[in-house]
UniProtKB/Swiss-Prot annotation:
Residues 186-205 have a biased composition (Basic residues). This is Spermatogenesis-associated protein 24. It comes from Mus musculus (Mouse). Its main location: cytoplasm. It is found in: Cytoplasm; Nucleus, Nucleolus; Nucleus, Nucleoplasm. Keywords: Coiled coil, Cytoplasm, Developmental protein, Differentiation, DNA-binding, Nucleus, Spermatogenesis, Transcription, Transcription regulation.
Amino acid sequence: MATPLGWSQGGSGSVCLAFDQLRDVIESQEELIHQLRNVMVLQDENFVSKEEFHEIEKKLVEEKAAHAKTKALLAKEEEKLQFALGEVEVLSKQLEKEKMAFEKALSSVKSRVLQESSKKDQLITKCNEIESHIIKQEDILNGKENEIKELQQVISQQKQNFRNHISDFRIQKQQETYMAQVLDQKRKKATGMRRARSRQCSREK
């Protein structure tokens, strides 16, 4: 921001100090003018000389001029002060506006962060639930696979036992057939021998 003409970088504090100092000077000048007027009145009453009167009158004019100059300077400084105060007010409002905008943006960011954090926590919880469900399903699947393996072993053992049983049955059947054949041959042989004896006995008679 550009510095106004006659305005120092000291800020509004230095302007207020200069303003107070000028006010003190004006009060001193007014007091001096009052004293000079009293002196002129006293001199008039005491019939002062014309030279002294002109000298006092000259000083009074000079003091009035200085007083007017000081008042003009004071008015100028007051104008600078009001300008500075106006700038301070504008800057304060702008700063407050920027502060409110920043706080609003910060609040929005915090809200988004909390929402994202909440979503993240929900996703983590969901993933953990899915992972836990998968582990349970894997455990169930492993249990089923073990049951299937056990059943396969039982079936395989039963098949083997059945095959062994069939083999034993065939062997037994073969043995029974063989024994039947042997017995049949023995019966036939015995029958033939009995018939032969019977015929021989008939001949002898």
